[in-house]
């Protein structure tokens, strides 16, 4: 996650935008915190003289205009972006509802539910709006308020975007214990949560297959097509765009410019 944050791991610019919704992110978090495998990722070492990909940072990562990446993500964009955005970034995660409405969310885990083996882990994952308040009755009734640290401590709700940073979660632990006046029950709950969720998550790894920078262009193209025909499948246009991108030709941009120049929107449109 740190290399995504610093821009050393980036995406080929032709890669589609991030498309995972809120429910899918919560399911991924649940799988990872349970230690379940979520599949491998595939990277390409940057610097192949015959492949001229433009690159861009992962959604939510700081701008890295002056950073030359070490590697590009060929497969695993959705999973890695979800993990980075929800478990590492300080920003609210830009995602969408099941119906496609764009939303911004922070992710929490209910410690009481998380340590209870009879409760499905996904049911302990909670997403809240950017203001960290869940409301009902058109905003008039507050169902859950996590807008301050004290509210987090009071409701045993751990902010997931600090879970990969030992210094941050250790400080949260100290403040949590202080808030509860070092109550033995609170201490036991946190230590259970630490051993069952935080420590295993810190040891969790996603397998990575790395193609070296000398891999032939044709092989990279074939691999990209093979790994991107499952999951959220790419369209034929997106696959062709990837092929042209290897020669530093931005097919999508060229198509959109020609469409704008020669055709009206109601005659021809490109579906992303």
What are these regions (language model features)?
Residues 1-22, 26-272:
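Basic- and aromatic-enriched surface patches that contact anionic nucleotides/nucleic acids
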């Amino acid at each position: 996650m740190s290399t995504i944050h610093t821009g050393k791991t980036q995406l080929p610019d032709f890669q589609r935008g991030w498309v995972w919704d809120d429910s899918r992110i919560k399911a991924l978090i649940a799988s990872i915190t349970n230690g379940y495998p979520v599949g491998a990722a595939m990277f390409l070492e940057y610097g192949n003289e015959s492949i001229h990909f433009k690159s861009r940072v992962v959604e939510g990562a700081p701008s890295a205009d002056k950073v030359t990446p070490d590697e590009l993500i060929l497969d695993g964009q959705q999973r890695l972006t979800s993990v980075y955005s929800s478990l590492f970034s300080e920003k609210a995660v830009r995602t969408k509802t099941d119906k496609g409405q764009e939303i911004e969310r922070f992710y929490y885990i209910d410690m009481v539910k998380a340590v209870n083996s009879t409760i499905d882990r996904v049911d302990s994952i909670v997403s809240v709006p950017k203001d960290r308040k869940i409301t009902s009755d058109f905003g008039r009734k507050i169902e859950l308020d996590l807008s301050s640290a004290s509210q987090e401590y009071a409701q045993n709700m751990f902010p997931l975007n600090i879970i990969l940073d030992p210094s941050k979660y250790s400080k949260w632990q100290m403040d949590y214990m202080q808030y509860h006046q070092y109550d033995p029950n609170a201490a036991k709950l946190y230590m259970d949560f630490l051993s069952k969720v935080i420590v295993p998550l810190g040891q969790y790894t996603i397998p990575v297959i790395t193609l070296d920078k000398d891999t032939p262009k044709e092989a990279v193209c074939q691999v990209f097509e093979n790994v991107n025909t499952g999951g959220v499948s790419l369209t034929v246009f997106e696959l062709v765009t990837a092929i042209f991108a290897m020669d530093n030709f931005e097919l999508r941009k060229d198509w959109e410019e020609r469409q704008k120049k020669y055709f009206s929107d109601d005659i021809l449109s490109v579906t992303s």
